[in-house]
Structure formats: C-alpha cells, structure tokens
Amino acid sequence: MLRGEIWQVDLDPARGSAANMRRPAVIVSNDRANAAAIRLDRGVVPVVPVTSNTEKVPIPGVVAGSERWPGRRFEGAGPAGWIRRCATSPLPS
C-alpha cells in the first residue's frame, strides 16, 4: 500500500451526502505510516474517494489518479475535502 495508489475501499457508513459504498480511493498517507499500520495489523490510513465523473469535482484541492483495474483503466478525481479514514485490515491485499 503506497501513497498515490488506488484501492477499492468500503466507505459505509457515511453521513449526509458523503461518498459511501465500495468505491475506488487514493491512498494519501505517507509510505512509512502505511507500512507501520500494515505491520502492526491495526490503524487507519487516510484516503480520498475518487469518481470518474470529474465534472462534479469542485476545484481546488483535487487528488487524481489512474490505476490498472481488471479489464479496464480507471481515471478519476476527488477533492481533498472528501478525505476519509479506512482501517487497514479490511483493505484487499
């Protein structure tokens, strides 16, 4: 798990109009913190959910990424204001 990678994460439960469900998100924490969270098998990492509908993403503070997903290429963006925390244990390896 490295900074800038796109992972599929479960964002439920969400409040209000926040992004929810299982969706792609960009890892935004530094690599040392990610490695420690995985090694200790506990902790959370900050992520920014991304959407392929980039016209809805308000500027400034956009986090964008592109990653190879099975069968298709994903490109999307999400404003840094959408930052969420995800536990490392349920993230797929």
Curated annotation (Swiss-Prot):
Record has Signal as a keyword: no
Subunit structure, as described in the record: Forms a complex with cognate antitoxin MazE1.
EC assignment: 3.1.-.-
Function comment: Toxic component of a type II toxin-antitoxin (TA) system, its cognate antitoxin is MazE1. Probably an endoribonuclease.
Pfam families linked: PemK_toxin (PF02452)
One example of a Gene Ontology biological process annotation: rRNA catabolic process
Name listed for the protein in its UniProt record: Probable endoribonuclease MazF1
Family: Belongs to the PemK/MazF family.
Key words of the record: Endonuclease, Hydrolase, Nuclease, Toxin-antitoxin system
GO MF, any single term: RNA endonuclease activity
Domain of life according to the entry: Bacteria
